[in-house]
């Protein structure tokens, strides 16, 4: 384990279980039948415990959309060419992508982070330049990243989470952009969760049956080529991941270290979450999985993690779109907790005894 990574992991502590009884009692005292707001109450309770605050704040929200290219795109595993990655980054910076519309609607700030796009961007508003390399190497023929580069990307994600917490953000979210990135995400799931490649490989941006079979073969080849390197979760990330996935893992770890809840987007972001969970299981206390992706395999991944995503809307876009929508529900749940009257304060009669 790299020393800098171990120092980050050592800063992550489990959520404050000591507040659980008081928070539950408060939820039960609100002017409603106990438990009648269902998962909104569960979400509010988890948020309280994660923040360690019985009167939690939630007004400032931010999503970081991490972008990177992938050498494995050369294997023809995506329906779109690699040049779409920088094109979509420009679209986001111009405000025209789905994530822009949804973050504006939800009152969420958005940063687009260049972790490894094969393009030199000028200085633009909303763009955070943290490029490690101009794309990963082809994991079908060797490791996607060196361990040094993977560590740099991971620690960059952690730094961005810490900076956001210091800037007063209460809730963070992940997003990503990178042509072919369902391929490394699937490889990471197969190795880290011990599931078959066939069961979790999906169509990504819309590949046909023939290309799907090819994608499965490429992922299996990558795992075979890099199998001896996959001795730890971090080594597996370096061998089979990508710069945006490494940054997402670090972003989640950094958020947990700062006791800041983080909303995980879909199939790709969940791969970063799996890496983070394998490195430090305590981060689960700070995670909200935003939605069940329509991408094949995400349900199996969520079941393996024992996770229950907030939404099921057949989303498969990425970018942070599911996280932006889920943030509104989380904010609503926290407002219920903070702003509803209690039976005692409102002088509303409680349920009579049987």
From Swiss-Prot:
Active site as annotated: 319 (proton acceptor)
Disulfide-bond pairs as recorded: none
Family: Belongs to the CobT family.
Alphabetical list of CDD domains matching this protein: DMB-PRT_CobT
GO molecular function: nicotinate-nucleotide-dimethylbenzimidazole phosphoribosyltransferase activity
Function field: Catalyzes the synthesis of alpha-ribazole-5'-phosphate from nicotinate mononucleotide (NAMN) and 5,6-dimethylbenzimidazole (DMB).
Catalysed conversion reaction: 5,6-dimethylbenzimidazole + nicotinate beta-D-ribonucleotide = alpha-ribazole 5'-phosphate + nicotinate + H(+)
Pathway: Nucleoside biosynthesis; alpha-ribazole biosynthesis; alpha-ribazole from 5,6-dimethylbenzimidazole: step 1/2
Superkingdom of origin organism: Bacteria
HAMAP family in the cross-refs: CobT
Keywords, comma-separated and alphabetical: Cobalamin biosynthesis, Glycosyltransferase, Transferase
GO terms of biological process kind: cobalamin biosynthetic process
Pfam families: DBI_PRT
InterPro entries, per the entry: Nict_dMeBzImd_PRibTrfase, Nict_dMeBzImd_PRibTrfase_bact, Nict_dMeBzImd_PRibTrfase_N, Nict_dMeBzImd_PRibTrfase_sf
Lineage: Bacteria, Pseudomonadati, Chlorobiota, Chlorobiia, Chlorobiales
UniProt-recorded name of the protein: Nicotinate-nucleotide--dimethylbenzimidazole phosphoribosyltransferase
The gene coding this protein: cobT
């Amino acid at each position: 384990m790299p020393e800098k990574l171990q120092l980050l992991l050592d800063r992550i502590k489990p959520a404050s279980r000591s507040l659980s009884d008081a928070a539950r009692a408060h939820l039960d005292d609100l002017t409603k039948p106990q438990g009648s707001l269902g998962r909104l109450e569960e979400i509010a309770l988890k948020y309280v415990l994660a923040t360690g605050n019985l009167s939690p704040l939630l007004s400032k929200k931010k999503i970081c959309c991490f972008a990177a290219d992938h050498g494995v795109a050369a294997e023809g595993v995506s329906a779109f060419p690699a040049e779409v990655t920088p094109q979509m980054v420009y679209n986001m910076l111009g405000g025209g992508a789905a994530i822009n519309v949804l973050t504006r609607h939800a009152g969420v700030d958005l940063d687009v982070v260049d972790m490894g796009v094969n393009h030199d961007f000028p200085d633009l508003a909303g763009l955070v330049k943290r490029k490690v390399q101009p794309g990963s190497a082809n994991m079908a023929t060797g490791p996607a990243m060196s361990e040094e580069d993977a560590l740099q990307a991971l620690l960059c994600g952690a730094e961005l989470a810490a900076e956001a917490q210091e800037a007063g953000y209460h809730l963070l979210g992940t997003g990503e952009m990178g042509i072919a990135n369902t391929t490394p995400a699937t490889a990471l799931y197969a190795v880290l969760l011990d599931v078959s490649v066939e069961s979790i490989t999906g169509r990504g941006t819309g590949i046909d049956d023939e290309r799907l079979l090819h994608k499965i073969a490429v992922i299996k080849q990558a795992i075979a080529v890099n199998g001896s390197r996959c001795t730890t979760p971090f080594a597996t990330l370096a061998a089979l991941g990508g710069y945006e996935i490494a940054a997402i893992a670090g972003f989640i770890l950094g958020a947990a270290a700062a006791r800041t809840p983080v909303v995980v987007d879909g199939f790709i972001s969940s791969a970063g979450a799996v890496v983070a969970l394998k490195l430090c299981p305590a981060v689960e206390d700070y995670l909200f999985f935003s939605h069940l992706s329509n991408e094949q395999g995400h349900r199996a991944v969520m079941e393996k993690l024992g996770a229950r995503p907030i939404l099921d809307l057949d989303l498969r876009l990425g970018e942070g779109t599911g996280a932006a929508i889920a943030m509104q529900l989380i904010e609503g749940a926290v407002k219920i907790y903070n702003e509803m009257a209690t039976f005692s304060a409102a002088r509303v009669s409680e349920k009579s005894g049987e």
